[in-house]
Amino acid sequence: LAFTRSLTLHLSELPRGKVLGIVNFPTFRQAMAAAQHIVKLGPTAVELVDRIMIELALANPAFKPTIETALIGKPAAILLVEFAGADAAALQGKLRDLQALMGDLGLPGSVVPMPDEAPQKNLWEVRKAGLNIMMSLKGDGKPVSFIEDCAVPLEHLADYTDALTEV
């Protein structure tokens, strides 16, 4: 509880544009290790889609066309990297920076640029539907939301997720 006599609220203008770079990784660990470098580019969001989720989306006729637009080959994981801002040219530059970074990290040609709003929205919807897609697994075993988010320094994220996977 608090008593407030005065409050100053600083509002920011909503970004006018967004671009999405989908980074495809051959291993889950590489995706986790790359996060510490990707955040230095200043994205507004970085979200993981792992192999299980990718396979389930591909098996679902409603999601298959959308997820296919994001894939290069058969990745073990993808990161959805979103940049937002008012300057369209600057946003395109951010996508180029992401592509260059991935080349520097040994993964040239791993980024699917998605500059248009409609495909971005569709892909975010697939990501958002993740738990429902996971619940569509056949059989008695169903996924349990064990750890949603964690606070781990990014330089330790790959080791952390490796250790967690062993559990």
Question: For the regions a protein language model found, what residue spans apply to each?
Answer:
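Noncatalytic alpha-helical scaffold of FAD-dependent oxidoreductases
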Residues: 1-167
